UniProtKB/Swiss-Prot annotation:
Pathway listed: Cell wall biogenesis; teichoic acid biosynthesis
Disruption phenotype: Mutant shows a greatly reduced galactosamine content, abnormal colony morphology and is devoid of UDP-N-acetylglucosamine 4-epimerase activity. Disruption of the gene can suppress the tetracycline sensitivity of the ezrA mutant.
One of the record's GO molecular function terms: UDP-glucose 4-epimerase activity
Family matches, as InterPro entries: NAD(P)-bd_dom, NAD(P)-bd_dom_sf, UDP_G4E
Gene name for this UniProt entry: galE
NCBIfam families: galE (TIGR01179), PRK10675.1 (NF007956)
This protein's UniProt keywords: Carbohydrate metabolism, Cell wall biogenesis/degradation, Isomerase, NAD, Teichoic acid biosynthesis
SUPFAM superfamilies referenced in this protein's UniProt entry, alphabetically: NAD(P)-binding Rossmann-fold domains
Induction comment: Transcription is repressed by glucose but is not influenced by galactose.
Protein name: UDP-glucose 4-epimerase
Active site: 148 (proton acceptor)
Organism in which the protein naturally occurs: Bacillus subtilis (strain 168)
Catalytic activity, EC: 5.1.3.2, 5.1.3.7
């Protein structure tokens, strides 16, 4: 029996593949490589010394998805695949709705056809919209502020409805906060196409000299230094959370949401200073206007994941920065460095 990992060549997906292989699972990866590299999977095999099955295919291709299930004994699915840039989703909403929703429909229809009713879904803290306070618990009001977040919210509801209709379904909805860092080997890490959308890969690329300076959006928030506060979680902690969630769906039925965060918030400037300290490089920055929809403070209450999944984040800020710098400095052009 194997675990199907959609989007398994991506940033969080590739790190989760490492943890799955190291935990003894057989894995099948489906990825269209639209925002990832097959080199990541080569390195997953190198890190673990284990093999995996890879299909370069799109979830929108119903025949390709069907053949993955026909050719492999799939026991459960971890579903990462999807478009994920908030700003782009505002500019081209139809593309996001079509890709993220239709792809998941085709996946779930194949799962139903082949009797696979266990799924771990990659959701996001964006489903909380603009939370009034932090820390955020799973029962906070939901409401997305952009089409990307809206697709996550809609898919959460659709997966819950599957369980309501057929209680043999087992669904874990993982709401990530801000993934950061890289595998400690320095062999896999975050490799965004073009200019990064997220703070820390941008900081890393400034430190390594690929980008000139960082734009810090907003320095007038009601926080200790005026910059936004977020919950940054080491990507390996996040990957371990997926293995724990997989154990849960394999051994029980239900549909539950879990926050995967550290429960601690750091400001943009704290992150920049921590990265400068670890890398020994200066990260020049300038202040810019707030981005529409950004909020002052957002961090998780991860108590439910600890209680029900037996998971908690173990790696701190310094380790995140050190691992990120090791990856970025030894792979200046990401996976393209290997070509």
């Amino acid at each position: 029996m194997a675990i199907l990992v959609t989007g398994g060549a991506g940033y969080i997906g590739s790190h989760t593949c490492v943890e799955l292989l190291n935990s003894g699972y057989e894995i099948v990866v489906l990825d269209n490589l639209s925002n990832s590299s097959a080199e990541a999977l080569n390195r997953v095999k190198e890190i673990t010394g284990k093999d995996l099955t890879f299909y370069e295919a799109d979830l929108l291709d119903r025949e390709a998805v069907d053949s993955v299930f026909a050719e492999n004994e799939i026991e459960a699915v971890i579903h990462f695949a999807g478009l994920k840039a908030v700003g782009e989703s505002v500019a081209i909403p139809l593309k996001y709705y079509h890709n993220n929703l239709t792809g998941t429909f085709i996946l779930c229809e194949a799962m139903e056809k082949y009797g696979v009713k266990k799924i771990v879904f990659s959701s996001s803290a964006t489903v909380y919209g603009v939370p009034e306070t932090s820390p955020i618990t799973e029962d906070f009001p939901l409401g997305a502020t952009n089409p990307y977040g809206q697709t996550k919210l809609m898919l959460e509801q659709i997966l819950r409805d599957l369980h309501t209709a057929d209680n043999e379904w087992s669904v874990a909805l993982l709401r990530y906060f801000n993934p950061f860092g890289a595998h400690p080997s320095g062999r896999i890490g975050e490799d965004p196409n073009g200019i990064p959308n997220n703070l820390m890969p941008y900081v890393a690329q400034v430190a390594v000299g690929k980008l000139e300076q960082l734009s810090v959006f907003g320095n007038d928030y009601p926080t200790k230094d005026g910059t936004g506060v977020r919950d940054y979680i080491h990507v390996v902690d996040l990957a371990e959370g997926h293995v724990k969630a997989l154990e849960k769906v394999l051994n029980s039925t239900g549909a539950d949401a879990y926050n995967l965060g550290t429960g601690t918030g750091y400001s943009v400037l704290e992150m920049v200073k921590a990265f400068e300290k670890v890398s020994g490089k200066e990260v020049p920055y300038r202040f810019a206007d707030r981005r529409p929809g950004d909020i002052a403070t957002c961090f998780a209450d991860p108590a439910k994941a600890k209680r029900e999944l037996g998971w908690e984040a173990k790696r701190g800020l310094e380790e995140m920065c050190a691992d990120s710098w090791r990856w970025q400095s030894s792979n200046v052009n990401g996976y393209k460095s290997a070509e």
